[in-house]
C-alpha cells in the first residue's frame, strides 16, 4: 500500500473510533452523569453552562439529548392520536364528602380516595411520559436535607415512569452519592449562592424559568418544583399531573380567606385585598406542564423585581407572589394537604395518607442571616 493509501486508511480508523466513543458516552447504557456548572445561565443561552463528566456514583444511566428528542417527537404524535382522558374517567369527588373536592371553577382537589389509580396508570403508561422534579439545596440545606429528600423521592415519586431530578446546589462537591432506581436520572447544576435565604427563595423562580427555556421544556412532559426540607412518605403519583398544579398549605386549608397570610400591603405586587382569595397555596410544591410552570415562574419573578424596585419585600417572599399568581390564573388541579403535611398539626381524620411530610424546621442551623 502506498503512502497516500496508508494516510487515508489511518484517517478512516481514527474517525471510526471517535464516532464509536461519542455514541457510547451519549447512549443510555453509558456510565456517566453530566453535571452542569451554571453560575448564572442566561435565558436560552447554553454557552454560559460549563460541565464535567463524573463517574455514575449517582445513577445507573445518563440522558441522551438526540435520542430523547427523537422519542419526544414520536410521543407527541402518539398523544395527538390517543383518546384524551376525561376527568370523570378517573376522578370521583363524591368519594370524599367530608372535604372540598371541587373548586368554584370546577378544578379537582385531589384527596386520597377520589381518584382511580389503575385508570391513570394505564393512560400515562401509554403516553410514555417523562416527569421532571426541581429541588434547590444551598449552603447547609445540602447536608441537612438533600440526601433524605432524594432517597425518598427515588422511592415514591412517579414510580414506574421516567423521571429526571434537576438538583440545584451551590457546591457540587457536597452532592450526596445516591444510586437511583430504573427510569431515573440526575442533572446537577451549580448555582450562585445568595447572601440571604430570602433571596435564595425568590431567585429560584428566575433560575427555574431559565432552565425550562434552556433545556427542560425539551426533556419532560410535566414538571414539579419542590422544597428540599420535606420527605416523601407514600406514593406521589400520576394523579397529581395537570396543566397547572397548586398545593394546599396544611395550616390554612380549613381557614377563611380573610385569615390567610396573603400580602396585604397595596405597595407590593403580591397584594391581595381582604375579601378576595380562594385558597392559601404552599410554595413548597407546585407544578404543571413546562409551559405553564415557565409562566408561573416568570410572572412571580416579575412581581419580585417590581417589589425590589419599590423597596418592598412580600411577607412570604416567593410564596406570596405564587398566591397572587394563582388568584389571577386559577390552577387546573389542586393537591390536598395530604401531599404536603406537617405532623406538628397532628393527624385529623380527613388526612388519610400522608404523601409528603415537612421536615423539622432547624432555621438556626441552615439559614445564615438569622
Swiss-Prot record:
Catalytic residues (positions):
319 (nucleophile)
What are the record keywords, sorted? Glycoprotein, Glycosyltransferase, Golgi apparatus, Manganese, Membrane, Metal-binding, Signal-anchor, Transferase, Transmembrane, Transmembrane helix
Q: Which cofactor does it need?
A: Mn(2+)
Where, in this chain's numbering, is Mn(2+) bound?
A: 227, 229
Look up and give the membrane topology term: Single-pass type II membrane protein
Topological domain ranges for the Lumenal compartment: 26-370
Provide the primary localization: Golgi
GO cellular component, as recorded: Golgi apparatus; Golgi cisterna; Golgi cisterna membrane; vesicle
* Disulfide partners: none
Q: Which GO terms describe its biological process?
A: carbohydrate metabolic process; lipid glycosylation; protein glycosylation
Q: How is the cofactor bound?
A: Binds 1 Mn(2+) ion per subunit.
Gene3D superfamilies according to UniProt: Spore Coat Polysaccharide Biosynthesis Protein SpsA, Chain A
Q: Which reaction does it catalyse?
A: a beta-D-galactosyl-(1->4)-N-acetyl-beta-D-glucosaminyl derivative + UDP-alpha-D-galactose = an alpha-D-galactosyl-(1->3)-beta-D-galactosyl-(1->4)-N-acetyl-beta-D-glucosaminyl derivative + UDP + H(+)
Which residues have a glycan attached per UniProt? 60, 295
| Segments on the Cytoplasmic side according to the record's topology features | 1-6
Residues reported in the UniProt entry to bind substrate: 136-141, 227-229, 249-252, 261, 361-367
Could you tell me what this protein does? Synthesizes the galactose-alpha(1,3)-galactose group by catalyzing the transfer of a galactose residue, with an alpha-1,3 linkage, on terminal lactosaminide (Gal-beta-1,4-GlcNAc-R) disaccharide borne by a glycoprotein or a glycolipid. Preferentially glycosylates proteins, can synthesize galactose-alpha(1,3)-galactose on glycoproteins but cannot synthesize the glycolipid called isogloboside 3 (iGb3).
Which family is annotated? Belongs to the glycosyltransferase 6 family.
Q: What is this protein called?
A: N-acetyllactosaminide alpha-1,3-galactosyltransferase
Q: Which organism is it from?
A: Felis catus (Cat)
Amino acid at each position: 500500500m502506498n503512502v497516500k493509501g496508508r494516510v487515508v486508511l489511518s484517517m478512516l480508523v481514527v474517525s471510526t473510533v471517535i464516532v464509536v466513543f461519542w455514541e457510547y458516552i451519549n447512549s443510555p447504557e453509558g456510565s456517566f452523569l453530566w453535571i452542569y456548572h451554571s453560575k448564572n445561565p442566561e435565558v436560552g443561552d447554553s454557552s454560559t453552562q460549563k460541565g464535567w463528566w463524573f463517574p455514575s456514583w449517582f445513577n445507573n444511566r445518563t440522558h441522551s439529548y438526540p435520542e430523547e428528542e427523537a422519542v419526544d417527537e414520536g410521543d407527541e404524535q402518539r398523544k395527538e392520536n390517543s383518546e384524551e382522558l376525561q376527568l370523570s374517567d378517573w376522578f370521583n369527588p363524591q368519594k370524599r364528602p367530608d372535604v372540598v373536592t371541587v373548586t368554584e371553577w370546577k378544578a379537582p382537589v385531589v384527596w386520597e380516595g377520589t381518584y382511580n389509580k389503575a385508570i391513570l396508570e394505564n393512560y400515562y403508561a401509554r403516553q410514555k411520559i417523562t416527569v421532571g422534579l426541581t429541588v434547590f439545596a444551598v449552603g447547609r440545606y445540602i447536608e441537612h436535607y438533600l440526601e433524605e429528600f432524594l432517597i425518598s423521592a427515588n422511592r415514591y415519586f412517579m414510580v414506574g415512569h421516567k423521571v429526571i431530578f434537576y438538583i440545584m446546589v451551590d457546591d457540587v462537591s457536597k452532592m450526596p452519592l445516591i444510586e437511583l432506581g430504573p427510569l431515573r436520572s440526575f442533572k446537577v447544576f451549580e448555582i450562585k449562592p445568595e447572601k440571604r435565604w430570602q433571596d435564595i427563595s425568590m431567585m429560584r423562580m428566575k433560575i427555574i424559568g431559565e432552565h425550562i427555556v434552556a433545556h427542560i421544556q425539551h426533556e419532560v412532559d410535566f414538571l414539579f418544583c419542590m422544597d428540599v426540607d420535606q420527605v416523601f412518605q407514600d406514593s406521589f403519583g400520576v394523579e397529581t399531573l395537570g396543566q397547572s398544579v397548586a398545593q394546599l398549605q396544611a395550616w390554612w386549608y380549613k381557614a377563611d380567606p380573610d385569615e390567610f397570610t396573603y400580602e396585604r400591603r397595596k405597595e407590593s405586587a403580591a397584594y391581595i385585598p381582604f375579601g378576595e382569595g380562594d385558597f392559601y397555596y404552599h410554595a413548597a410544591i407546585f407544578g404543571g406542564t413546562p409551559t405553564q410552570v415557565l409562566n408561573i415562574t416568570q410572572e412571580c419573578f416579575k412581581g419580585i423585581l417590581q417589589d425590589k424596585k419599590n423597596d418592598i419585600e412580600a411577607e412570604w417572599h416567593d410564596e406570596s407572589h405564587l398566591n397572587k399568581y394563582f388568584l389571577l390564573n386559577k390552577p387546573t388541579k389542586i393537591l390536598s394537604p395530604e401531599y404536603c403535611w406537617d405532623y406538628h398539626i397532628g393527624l385529623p381524620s380527613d388526612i388519610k395518607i400522608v404523601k409528603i411530610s415537612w421536615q423539622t424546621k432547624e432555621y438556626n442551623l441552615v439559614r445564615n442571616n438569622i
